[in-house]
Amino acid sequence: MTPRGRIAGLSGILAGVGLAVEGALWATSGWTADTFGDSATALAFLRDHGSHLRAAVLAGAINLVLVTVFTVGLAARLATTAPTRAAATLYLGIIGIAGHSLVPLGLRLGVPTFVELAVGDPSAAAAAWSGYASFQTAAGAVGALFLGLSTLAAGWAIISLRALPVLLGWLGVLTGAASAVTVLTAETPLAFLAAGAYLPSLTLAIVFRVWAGIGLWKGEVQPAVEQGRPGHQRPAPNLGS
């Protein structure tokens, strides 16, 4: 079963807006890329800004529900013309959502635990933080990589078979590639690319979700070859889809 086009479209629009809200909450919490790298800094941050951070990750968890409905609906739209790439969009997206869901849920539950532990046993809290932070980083990387690959597959299908506007397809490819770069170049000599691609990948993902959501809402299908009119041949099957 798949969601109705308008439900999937609305979910995509809200997922884009939700990602912007989540990003704004993270930014206004005072968090930076280096905050979680040092246990003392991280625990002090959780003590002072834990409530703000928990609001941000709650928004993220809600947003992932919307992304799930949107991804299933988008894959269903693409399946009629590009079944293989639609399957990639769906399954890669589900893996990415599952991985990424561990980040907001882990922080939502972990923040009060670490704050309490830091008060009672600072040494134990500091010792436990390193492993916890590494797990959070890994879960986020799984989410970013597989959601990026899902978006790239969707963009490729749109470009090839005109299931939605071609410019949206190119945006999807660019979004997915940027997201993959943020993961694959991290902790390498090319780490500067990961840092530089992070904000653009986030912005592109917001635009892609909103635009694709609008397309699903409107039911904009643009067949590559118009069928049913005299003088027009049926298109040959696309064996590479």
Q: In which residue ranges do the predicted regions lie?
A:
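Hydrophobic, aromatic-enriched alpha-helical segments typical of multi-pass transmembrane helices
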Residues: 1-241
